[in-house]
Amino acid sequence: CDSVRALDESGVDVVMPIIHFGTEYREMPDSWQEKCVDLLFEAGADVIVGGHPHVVEPMEIREIRNDDGTTRTGYVIYSLGNFISSQRYENGVMKDIGLIMDMDFEKQNGETRLTGWRFAPTYVYWTDDVIGVVPVVEAYENRDAYSFLSEKDWARIEDSYHKTIQTLTKITDCPYNIVDYEYNFEISE
């Protein structure tokens, strides 16, 4: 937290720690993750990106009270899941799903704010010759372009198309739409 505090006090536009934390294969943040997020926001983090659980965990938008009594908005994604790995779906654990995160920031009058937050879910598929990654929403909406995928792959893509957004919004039920094959969350100040 000292590094985060030092960065915040240095006047950088955005403080975004990337944290390796959480319980493997658990789709909700554990108490240690929640405590770390509290401390990082308290130290001045604006956006927190997590990894390690090997599954997608929720995003959260929080109102943070600063020491001077003012408030600001903080953003956290507890886990981006697995982008590419040899871990497979089993017993309801979505170890074959990951997220690509995209954020837009705008600076006006010396203030930087988040104006866009998007997630593109990904699926890891296997054949005898290839381990690859496909974008879930694009594949779901353009099945013909991904004809090399097996029926098992299609079942996983359909499941993750629906379940990923449910997981992302378990803590903060934020309005979203799908734009360019990404879950696009509405950010308001």
Question: Model-derived features: where do they sit?
Answer:
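Acidic, metal/ion-coordinating pockets
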Residues: 1-189
